[in-house]
Amino acid sequence: MFCRLAAGMVARLMSQMQCDLSVMISENDFNTFAMPELRKQCDFLQFPLYHFDGQEQRRHLQSLLSLEKLRVIQWTSVVGQPSPVEYLPTLQAMQKAGKSIFLMLKPYEIEPIMQGLSSKGLHFSVEAQSVEEADAIVKLVEKLSHE
């Protein structure tokens, strides 16, 4: 279950945890088979990050939020799924539970995400096509940042 993710975070023991099987199993099976292992990993790691396969893992969200030591949830929209913008209430629930969020966004998704979520603990990666576009993105984020 250990994977490497270059997320720009400095930690002695940082790792991306995931359970891709969870998209095919019930909540009961997830709680029985995956949660004990995820809990052990959270206890071991200094900076545990969970790779969350968007809408397909939403049924397991409450279990994941119960992992007290889980620091970050990386929301991943699987090909063909709607943008993370469509799941603002779910992302807000993650923040309310004290979890940071890591998103892979397109430039046009930044504004609604920044307006709908607190900037505290919000991390995202976005590709710019030029230096000018990157500068505009930074200015937009600075303008829209809020608690």
Give the ranges of each region predicted by the language model:
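Active-site loop segments of alpha/beta catalytic cores
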Residues: M1-E147
